């Protein structure tokens, strides 16, 4: 996995920018763990993940396992997070499927293809 992650506090939320390639289920899980580590490090509750320059797997199957991993193996505090992930338009379908799975499991994780829409959503959340 060739991936860089940079983080900074913005007014109202934590901004995480990812760039690189994620090709396998294992790399997808590792990407999520790296993001969660950043969230814990900053103590953030509202997070914008800019994955526009991240190449993601297009198969839907790994995302089922990923969401199950969130619910079963991450700390319960994960349910208090509000995450807006922004992907390139070619990943819109897979990101929307991920969002549907997350929301169905009680997570406030939403997918966008616009940074402006994602940041506006986060700032409007209580």
Say what each PLM segment does:
Residues 1-126:
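Amphipathic, Lys/Arg-enriched alpha-helical "gate/interface" segment within cytosolic domains
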């Amino acid at each position: 996995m060739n991936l860089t992650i940079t983080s900074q506090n913005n007014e109202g939320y934590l901004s995480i920018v990812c760039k690189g390639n994620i090709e396998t289920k294992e790399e997808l899980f590792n990407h999520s763990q790296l993001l969660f580590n950043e969230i814990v490090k900053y103590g953030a509750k509202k997070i914008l993940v800019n994955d526009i320059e991240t190449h993601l797997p297009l198969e839907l199957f790994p995302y089922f396992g990923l969401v199950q991993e969130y619910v079963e193996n991450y700390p319960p505090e994960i349910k208090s997070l509000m995450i807006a992930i922004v992907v390139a338009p070619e990943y819109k379908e897979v990101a929307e499927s991920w969002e549907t799975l997350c929301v169905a499991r009680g997570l406030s994780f939403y997918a966008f293809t616009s940074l402006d829409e994602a940041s506006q959503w986060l700032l409007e959340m209580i």
